[in-house]
């Protein structure tokens, strides 16, 4: 279960940092003993700056408790992130043996300055004005095992 939480934390952090012009798509997947996770990221940008990211995360498990735990953790995290940094909209639902989370982060509303200040390691992915760059988002996602096109 700790592996689950670690993976969710990393993916959620990535979700925070990614965020109209060009579109970059990244995806990742992970198979664990009790569940499988697949995540698709659609990163929209204006020039070299990320403006919006849309994430679809699907978690499949035969164990309803695993899905219910994921649902609670994800909803709590997204609600907290939206309260602290703004810019989040999300919907998490369970249908049978599948949990689907649809998340959008609008970087025009997201307080990236505050986020970078609270998460110093993120300076690696932003420019000098604390704007998330497309190259930074790509580097960040790749560091978590995602592939980007």
Q: PLM features: residue spans?
A:
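Sec-dependent N-terminal signal peptides of Gram-positive bacterial secreted proteins and lipoproteins
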Residues: 1-22
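Subset-of-secretome marker
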Residues: 22-149
